[in-house]
From Swiss-Prot:
InterPro entries: Ribosomal_bL36, Ribosomal_bL36_sp. Belongs to the bacterial ribosomal protein bL36 family. Keywords: Ribonucleoprotein, Ribosomal protein. One of its GO terms (cellular component) is cytoplasm. Pfam families: Ribosomal_L36. One of its GO terms (biological process) is translation. One of its GO terms (molecular function) is structural constituent of ribosome. This is Large ribosomal subunit protein bL36.
Length: 39
């Protein structure tokens, strides 16, 4: 899980979701693409 100030889709399988008020990227194809916005 990467924590970044700005999250972007890294491939076509990435999805942007909002959980508990946080913006997150989840990826079914490559788990390395998981990201969360905020510090």
């Amino acid at each position: 899980m990467k924590v970044r100030p700005s999250v972007k889709k890294m491939c076509e399988h990435c999805k942007i979701v909002k959980r508990n008020g946080r913006v997150m990227v989840i990826c079914s194809a490559n788990p390395k693409h998981k990201q969360r916005q905020g510090k």
